[in-house]
A protein has these predicted regions:
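Nucleotide 5′-phosphate-binding alpha/beta core
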Residues: 1-68, 72-73, 77-79, 83, ...
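Active-site glycine/GP-rich loop and adjacent strand/helix microenvironment
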Residues: 1, 68-70, 92-195
Length: 195
């Protein structure tokens, strides 16, 4: 049974030890967001292709062909920190997309708004990934309904705002996006999981 070959270790070891196969060398190191005020975890990944393929396969199991979508991202604290598995994943989706308009946004909401309006006007299928607090701030300052855009909120207020329930998040986002176009995506750096 292969499960017996997997060493089970506490998540806390990713904060204090270099966890990798004996003799292995990392091709990429992902770092957790560290939003709990604690030391960030580090995941030393020997074969980043495994993460790339698993993320893409999961994405396409839900949304089908990534090539058809314009991929945008509003992930300010992740971009500023660097080494984020979430940023890596979204960047890979952008590379796979056949659409020319794609990109990450920090705080240029006017440019993001203009791009979304252009894409909406053309009926282009669009996915906007965003950390919850940034999506709420952006959409509440942006008084237009989006019909061709899917929102994937990546969770949390990241210490920027008071935490609110998932239902409250969906109620706020639902004022701007149809409920069936709102998704949640959460990952755990230590497990290379994005779901």
């Amino acid at each position: 049974n292969l499960i017996n070959h997997i060493p089970f270790i506490p998540i806390s070891l990713f904060k204090s030890h270099r966890i990798i196969r004996t003799g292995g060398a990392e091709s990429v190191v992902f770092e957790s967001s560290g939003t709990t005020g604690m030391k960030s975890s580090k995941h030393f990944v020997e074969d980043e292709e495994i993460y790339r393929k698993s993320s893409l396969n999961y994405f396409q199991s839900i949304f089908k062909n990534v090539e058809e979508y314009t991929i945008l991202a509003l992930l300010p604290n992740y971009l500023q920190k660097g080494n984020s598995s979430l940023v890596y994943m979204v960047n890979e989706f952008m590379k796979c997309s056949k659409q020319t308009q794609k990109g990450f946004y920090l705080d240029d909401w006017r440019a993001l708004e203009n791009q979304l309006l252009d894409l909406e006007g053309r009926g282009q299928k669009t996915i906007l990934f965003g950390v919850t607090y940034a999506l709420i701030d952006f959409l509440t300052s942006f008084d237009t309904k989006l019909h061709n855009t899917t929102i994937i909120e990546t969770g949390g207020m990241k210490g920027r705002k008071e935490e609110i329930t998932k239902q409250a998040v969906y109620e706020i986002l639902g004022r701007y996006i149809p409920a069936e176009k709102i998704y949640s995506e959460y990952g755990m750096t230590e497990l290379l999981s994005q779901a």
